[in-house]
Swiss-Prot record:
It is an enzyme of class 7 (translocase). The lineage of its organism: Bacteria, Bacillati, Bacillota, Bacilli, Bacillales. ATP binds at G169, D170, R171, Q172, T173, G174, K175, T176. Produces ATP from ADP in the presence of a proton gradient across the membrane. The alpha chain is a regulatory subunit. This is ATP synthase subunit alpha.
Length: 502
């Protein structure tokens, strides 16, 4: 076999022509200190704030402190495998999470990785967890109601689509139950719900997921969980991951409800990170930007203008108080950012008033704009009646003789409190709420004994299902009250069949 020189030279020429020099440039630094979930690295001079970096063992980190001669990095995972002298390299990516329809019905961590054992999440789209809130001209005022199915909220402190309503109270006052009931009530309402559990026990999150599954609510819900055993950076990132997943749907013109349970734990995690990064502490040892931590999160809730698709993102942030002190640092911060608050009181909870909503301290700064016409008409005086009752109740304890008008107010108040009580995980459609509150405010319950009011309500709903469908349908379709004579006749007809307990 002879070697032909021209063939060899042709091959060499071809290889020279096709040669591509692919030089990969990457910024690499060195870990100079590591511990408590924080690493300091030298040599990453061009890293961006919030950029993802990768350690030699594959664990990711996020650059938070950009100092003169080193970078403070929070480690998003176990830090025991990282040691001094290890290599750390830039990725050029800002922290982002997977988004899309594939996440619905799944339980994921703040990095978007599934933790429910149902295999990988099949989605290719991502969104950065930090993104600017919609501008002034991109928004529209809140005008559509978000029905929670809880009488005390829908009547006294209504929530609208695109609103931010704080739920505040001590531990064990039913905050999570309010959120779960609201999510369950969004069935058939064309709503995507996102439940963000921050620093909760894993057993608690499991219970919530099972409750949602049992009521068929997991079909439109994403659960994001950063449990108490996770590193502080994941607790800090969880709410931003949740809102990024929600924004994907909002900008597509859909309606989203995001529950943050709870922001006190996120604030504590952020305080921990800030102190470990040696940022100067302020009041209660929180860093100076703790207000911005929550404001930039909650400002991303909005009702978009029609030009932007008309989608909405409603936020229900939770804050846990200590011994009912709503004037502490984090509660006052979040109250000033949100459009109202629902204050749950432990005294009411333990006295059997559940949901334990304090009508005096709870407000909705959107108010009537987030109620249907029918509810506005019947619930107008309800808050005043309740406030007057609470005031008179204090006087009545002294046992002095009361005039007829005061006795009537006390009797009406006691029945109002009974009507506003509600069992767990049993949200009530708004049309039925309107009719029972109409019966209450128009005096139809005044001659029913207080202990029979709950039974009256239950039997009234059953009676309406059989004999009052036309009234319910009227409220459902027109959002207004039916003819008052028809209503009065229907309630009187039911009262004749109702048997008072002896």
């Amino acid at each position: 076999m002879s070697i032909r020189a021209e063939e060899i030279s042709a091959l060499i020429k071809q290889q020279i022509e096709n040669y591509e020099s692919q030089i990969q440039v990457s910024d690499v630094g060195t870990v100079i200190q590591v511990g408590d979930g924080i690493a300091r690295a030298h040599g990453l001079d061009n890293v961006m704030s919030g950029e993802l970096v990768e350690f030699a063992n594959g664990v990711m980190g996020m650059a938070l402190n950009l100092e003169e001669n080193n970078v403070g990095i929070v480690i998003l995972g176990p830090y025991t495998g990282i040691k001094e002298g290890d290599e750390v390299r830039r990725t050029g990516r800002i922290m982002e999470v997977p988004v899309g329809e594939a996440l619905i019905g799944r339980v994921v961590n703040p990095l978007g990785q599934p933790v429910d054992g149902l295999g990988p999440v099949e989605t290719t789209e991502t969104r950065p967890i930090e993104s600017p809130a919609p501008g002034v001209m991109d928004r529209r005022s809140v005008h559509e109601p978000l029905q929670t199915g809880i009488k005390a909220i829908d009547a006294l402190v209504p929530i609208g689509r695109g609103q931010r309503e704080l739920i505040i109270g001590d531990r064990q006052t039913g905050k999570t139950s309010v959120a779960i009931d609201t999510i369950i009530n969004q069935k058939d309402q064309n709503m995507i719900c996102i439940y963000v559990a921050i620093g909760q026990k894993e057993s608690t999150v499991r219970t919530v997921v099972e409750t949602l599954r049992k009521h068929g609510a997991l079909d439109y819900t994403i659960v994001v969980t950063a449990s108490a055993s996770q590193p502080a950076p994941l607790l800090f990132l969880a709410p931003y991951a949740g809102v990024a997943m929600g924004e994907y749907f909002m900008y597509k013109g859909q309606h989203v409800l995001v529950v943050y349970d709870d922001l006190s734990k996120q604030a504590a995690a952020y305080r921990e990170l800030s102190l470990l990064l040696r940022r100067p502490p302020g009041r209660e040892a929180y860093p100076g930007d703790i207000f911005y931590l929550h404001s930039r999160l909650l400002e991303r809730a909005a009702k978009l203008s029609d030009a932007k698709g008309g989608g909405s993102l409603t936020a229900l942030p939770f804050v846990e108080t200590q011994a009912g002190d709503i004037s502490a640092y984090i509660p006052t911060n979040v109250i000033s950012i949100t459009d109202g608050q629902i204050f749950l009181q432990s005294d009411l909870f333990f006295s059997g008033v559940r949901p334990a909503i304090n009508a005096g301290l709870s407000v909705s700064r959107v108010g009537g704009a987030a109620q249907i016409k029918a509810m506005k008409k019947v619930a107008g005086t309800l808050r005043l009646d309740l406030a007057a009752y609470r005031e008179l109740e204090a006087f009545a304890q002294f046992g002095s003789d009361l005039d007829k008008a005061t006795q009537a107010k006390l009797a009406r108040g006691a029945r109002t409190v009974e009507v506003l009580k509600q069992d767990l995980h049993q949200p009530i459609p708004v049309e039925k709420q309107v009719l029972i509150i109409y019966a209450l405010t128009r005096g139809f319950l005044d001659d029913i004994p207080v202990e029979d009011v709950r039974r009256f309500e239950k039997e009234f709903y059953l009676w309406l299902d059989q004999n009052g469908q036309h009234l319910l349908e009227h409220i459902r379709t027109t959002k207004d009250l039916p003819n008052e004579d028809d209503l009065n006749k229907a309630i009187e007809a039911f009262k004749k069949t109702f048997v008072v307990s002896q």
